[in-house]
Amino acid sequence: MLRTLRPTLPSRCLRLYSTAPEKPSLKLVAELRKRTEVSIVKAREALSASNNDIEAALQWLAKDLETTGAKKAAKVGGRTTNEGLVSVSILSNFTASGLQRGIRAAMIELNCETDFVGRNELFGRLAGDIAHTAAVVAEPGASVFQNLSLEFLQEAPLVSRSDPTSAPSGTVATTIRDTIAKVGENITLRRALVVAAEPPAADAAQALRLGQYVHGTIHQPTEGRIGTLALLGLKYPSPKGFTQETTEKLASLERALARQIVGFPTQSIKGSEETALYSQPFMMLPGELNSRPVGEALQAWSVQQGIVGSEGDAGAVEVLEFAKWSVGEPLES
């Protein structure tokens, strides 16, 4: 009886085959990185773990970031943070008679360990979003300028400055934690200030306006090393309020005052010393009033705009209050 003979293969030549997951395409990796700003390695890992499904990969990354972020935050939590940014956000900068409009603004200081991270676009976006969130939650209180509780702010849902209508993806605190995981440095929210005023009564004789200026900006004109907010009080020149031309000149005056506060060692509004705003030469105001003491220049400007009849009429345009912050400066006790 004949038998079919087959060669016997050595056991070492036997192989088992299985279907390996498809390698994530460069297009999917790029799309995921664009939406999350994770590294290429992390994007590939997320897609591989999610069978190349973008939405599933986003969920995977969110869970991974929560875990790694908490570990990283705990690891770097004791490190000193002396660098960073001051960020300003203004939702509404004036009150006006007859308009149901109040002032809403905020200024925050966000710190990190190095100037390198302080200049990072991701860090700058975080600072801007936190300032915007602070302005959104601002409510009028006993004074127009108020310190905002950091605990309250960190528990608030983070509102995107660039897309404020989008649903928040987390709180201020969780977003700081996630950013720590991405940049590898400790990040701390040092202080927050809100400016809030209700719309004035219909027969109000004074308007409020808020000026701002940030020095040492990097990615946005509202984020830098030094920031200031300055509140102005103005008498109405007539029951109809200000003309369009005067309003435009007011905007220039506000910016000049804010720049003056930042550019000089300004510590108070009135007084005889050089740290008093009204005694300083108004170097930041262009035109014929340049170099006159700020207090005198404001009175002369009011006459030029027809707000008052003579420079002897006090209180036509006043700086009522200001806040000036520098990154890393000592805080008042």
Swiss-Prot record:
Looking up SUPFAM superfamilies in the UniProt record yields:
Elongation factor Ts (EF-Ts), dimerisation domain, UBA-like
Please identify the protein, giving its name as recorded. Answer: Elongation factor Ts, mitochondrial
Q: What is the protein's known function?
A: Associates with the EF-Tu.GDP complex and induces the exchange of GDP to GTP. It remains bound to the aminoacyl-tRNA.EF-Tu.GTP complex up to the GTP hydrolysis stage on the ribosome.
Localization per record: Mitochondrion
Q: Which GO terms describe its cellular component?
A: mitochondrion
Q: Which keywords are on file for this protein?
A: Elongation factor, Mitochondrion, Protein biosynthesis, Transit peptide
Which residues does the Swiss-Prot or TrEMBL entry list as transit peptide?
1-17
Q: Which GO terms describe its molecular function?
A: translation elongation factor activity
Q: Which InterPro entries match?
A: EF-Ts_dimer_sf, Transl_elong_EFTs/EF1B, Transl_elong_EFTs/EF1B_dimer, UBA-like_sf
Q: Which organism is it from?
A: Coprinopsis cinerea (strain Okayama-7 / 130 / ATCC MYA-4618 / FGSC 9003)
This chain is encoded by the gene named TSF1
Give TM regions.
none
Biological processes per GO annotation = mitochondrial translational elongation
- Homology family: Belongs to the EF-Ts family.
Upper classification of the source organism reads: Eukaryota, Fungi, Dikarya, Basidiomycota, Agaricomycotina
